[in-house]
């Protein structure tokens, strides 16, 4: 579960390395985000010469979450870290590569570009 002030790693090559959640989209009192949910983040660490810089505020989608999520077939999916992919204003990924596996739930949420760029879909 991702909430405000949660630190996350970035799973793309947009230039950001670490981000912090500052807002969870999806309702007035919504507190937690899970895999496939959009959040607002601020960049805490970035590589020099990247697309995004430190202190930038942008939207992101959660692609890996440490809290387990139950699937319809009864199985659970859980990752070792909380990771996001940064999005532009149109909802497309800002980077051109995705690092690490992503969850199958992104396909249901219509993030086909992220699913196609990912090296592995679990």
UniProtKB/Swiss-Prot annotation:
PANTHER family: 50S/60S RIBOSOMAL PROTEIN L14/L23, LARGE RIBOSOMAL SUBUNIT PROTEIN UL14M. Part of the 50S ribosomal subunit. Forms a cluster with proteins L3 and L19. In the 70S ribosome, L14 and L19 interact and together make contacts with the 16S rRNA in bridges B5 and B8. Keywords: Ribonucleoprotein, Ribosomal protein, RNA-binding, rRNA-binding. GO terms for biological process: translation. Belongs to the universal ribosomal protein uL14 family. InterPro entries: Ribosomal_uL14, Ribosomal_uL14_bac-type, Ribosomal_uL14_CS, Ribosomal_uL14_sf. Binds to 23S rRNA. Forms part of two intersubunit bridges in the 70S ribosome. GO terms for cellular component: cytosolic large ribosomal subunit. This is Large ribosomal subunit protein uL14. It holds the Pfam family Ribosomal_L14. GO terms for molecular function: large ribosomal subunit rRNA binding; structural constituent of ribosome. The gene is rplN. CDD domains: Ribosomal_uL14.
């Amino acid at each position: 579960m991702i909430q405000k002030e949660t630190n996350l790693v970035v799973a793309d090559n947009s230039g950001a390395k670490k981000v912090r959640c500052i807002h969870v989209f999806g309702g007035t009192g919504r507190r937690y985000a899970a895999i496939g949910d959009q959040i607002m983040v601020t960049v805490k660490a970035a590589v020099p010469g990247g697309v995004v810089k430190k202190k930038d505020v942008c939207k992101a989608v959660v692609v890996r979450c440490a809290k387990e999520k139950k699937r319809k077939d009864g199985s659970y999916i859980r990752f070792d870290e909380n990771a996001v992919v940064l999005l532009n204003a149109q909802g497309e990924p800002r980077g051109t590569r995705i690092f690490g596996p992503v969850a199958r739930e992104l396909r249901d949420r219509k993030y086909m570009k992220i699913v196609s760029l990912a090296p592995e879909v679990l």
